[in-house]
Curated annotation (Swiss-Prot):
It is an enzyme of class 3 (hydrolase). The cascade of activation of extracellular proteases proceeds from the metalloprotease aureolysin (aur), through SspA to SspB. Residues 39-50, 286-342 have a biased composition (Low complexity). This is Glutamyl endopeptidase. GO terms for molecular function: serine-type endopeptidase activity. Sequence repeats lie at residues 289-291, 292-294, 295-297, 298-300, 301-303, 304-306, 307-309, 310-312, 316-318, 319-321, 322-324, 325-327, 328-330. One of its GO terms (cellular component) is extracellular region. Pfam families: Trypsin_2 (PF13365). It catalyses: Preferential cleavage: Glu-|-Xaa, Asp-|-Xaa. It comes from Staphylococcus aureus (strain Mu50 / ATCC 700699).
């Protein structure tokens, strides 16, 4: 599979720059060129509830090449209880462009942020307000957590098809990550080939704004590239890939017909990018004692209990340590190293 992936990857990179979302229940899609990696931002403000375009109003466009990859393992089922558990942060996306309204998927990962694909945000043509998000959507008549309007877009600085979207609060001054609990990200330390996974999102070949889950296994994993044997269609772009712990291990981007579907794997490089740009993103190991980033970890240099932390009262170099020869309160008044010694 490794050789085959390398062979097809350059082909698919080319298609990503010219292809993206679905714009109708029939899974039609938009073409758009890639944009730069700088954030697209508009003035932050509370937004009115976005207007929802229903299936009959969505304009069909030309079919995107490789948007639909239905494999022999076509184990897809509808999720009707969308507001509970790890399904709640899965989000239905609409992008209103000059050539039509297009649909995609995403996942809420912070108080005001979600993750999706670069090729999804490219459809905004530089106007973040064109992107609307409806977390936990049940169908085109039922959006239990309302809608949110994007205010800023930041694309992943690497090659992976990944983007961060920041949203304004809604009319009730609620943030998107307050109406749903943001997803937990996996540290992916134990992720490997043959593990069971699911991709959950809003495929365009199903009734508009209905959530579907597809089950399968990882077939390839290297760097930021992950492939799997489950089925998806246009509209699944930006869907989260969950492991068996319901942690996000990747963001789905598309696939190659009769071959595989793929995602941006959340490896160390991607994880660092996300942490740098999303202050409150939560990875599964963040609160573990052995996580070096955990402030409670005694090995964290910022932890006052770290013996190497100069602020640790037991640290010999701590000026407040009475055993420090430079401390005026050092009981050894005859210590020649103490400038205040008697």
């Amino acid at each position: 599979m490794k050789g085959k992936f390398l062979k097809v990857s350059s082909l698919f990179v080319a298609t990503l720059t010219t292809a993206t979302l679905v714009s109708s229940p029939a899974a039609n899609a938009l073409s758009s060129k890639a944009m730069d990696n700088h954030p697209q931002q508009t003035q932050s403000s509370k937004q009115q509830t976005p207007k929802i375009k229903k299936g009959g109003n969505l304009k069909p466009l030309e079919q995107r090449e490789h948007a639909n990859v239905i494999l022999p393992n076509n184990d897809r089922h509808q999720i009707t209880d969308t507001t509970n558990g790890h399904y709640a942060p899965v989000t239905y996306i609409q992008v209103e462009a000059p050539t039509g309204t297009f649909i995609a998927s995403g996942v809420v990962v912070g108080k005001d942020t979600l993750l999706t694909n670069k090729h999804v945000v490219d459809a905004t043509h530089g106007d973040p307000h064109a992107l609307k998000a409806f977390p936990s959507a049940i169908n085109q008549d039922n959006y239990p957590n309302g809608g949110f309007t994007a205010e800023q877009i930041t694309k992943y600085s690497g090659e992976g098809d990944l983007a961060i979207v920041k949203f304004s609060p809604n009319e009730q001054n609620k943030h998107i990550g307050e109406v749903v609990k943001p997803a937990t990200m996996s540290n992916n330390a134990e992720t490997q080939v043959n593990q069971n996974i699911t991709v959950t999102g809003y495929p365009g070949d199903k009734p508009v704004a209905t959530m579907w889950e597809s089950k399968g296994k990882i077939t390839y994993l290297k760097g930021e590239a992950m492939q799997y044997d489950l089925s998806t269609t246009g509209g699944n772009s930006g869907s989260p890939v969950f492991n068996e712990k319901n942690e996000v291990i990747g963001i789905h981007w598309g696939g190659v017909p009769n071959e595989f579907n793929g995602a941006v794997f959340i490896n160390e490089n991607v994880r660092n990018f996300l942490k740098q740009n999303i202050e409150d993103i939560h990875f599964a190991n963040d609160d573990q004692p052995n996580n070096p980033d955990n402030p409670d970890n005694p090995n964290n240099p910022d932890n006052p209990n770290n013996p190497d932390n100069p602020n640790n009262p037991d640290e010999p170099n701590n000026p407040d340590n009475p055993n420090n020869p430079d401390n005026p309160d050092n009981g050894d008044n005859n210590n020649s190293d103490n400038p205040d010694a008697a």
